[in-house]
């Protein structure tokens, strides 16, 4: 009975170790070390064309260049189609994208991108109280 207990406990420890190893593994293409500083212009934000501005920096605060970023704007409620635009790098690590906000209210801005090293980048920002013209 002592040998069966040792085998059973060993099996449990192996399963736990595998589970911990899988749980601690960083998913590929996670862009964990990238910081995104987000701005929107003009202020206050009004219905019509706006410019989405953001800066990408790495873990040591160097600009992240060469990213391909799509900007998506969604109303926070159902019933309106999202709007999309491609961001352009205007200087190293600084990206801008025009985006038409067609309705007053709260918007969610999503960044979908690929960094120059192939890592994926996904970020979300809330833009509250877009004012009517």
Named regions from a protein language model:
Residues 2, 20-21:
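Coiled-coil-like amphipathic alpha-helices with heptad-repeat character
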Residues 1-11:
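Bacterial N-terminal signal peptides that target proteins for export
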Residues 3, 14, 59:
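Short, flexible active-site loop motifs that bind/organize anionic cofactors or intermediates
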Residues 24-133:
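N-terminal soluble domains immediately following signal/targeting peptides that reside
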Residues 5, 23-24:
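Intrinsically disordered, low-complexity sequence elements enriched in Ser/Thr/Gly/Pro
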Residues 10-20:
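Bacterial N-terminal signal peptides
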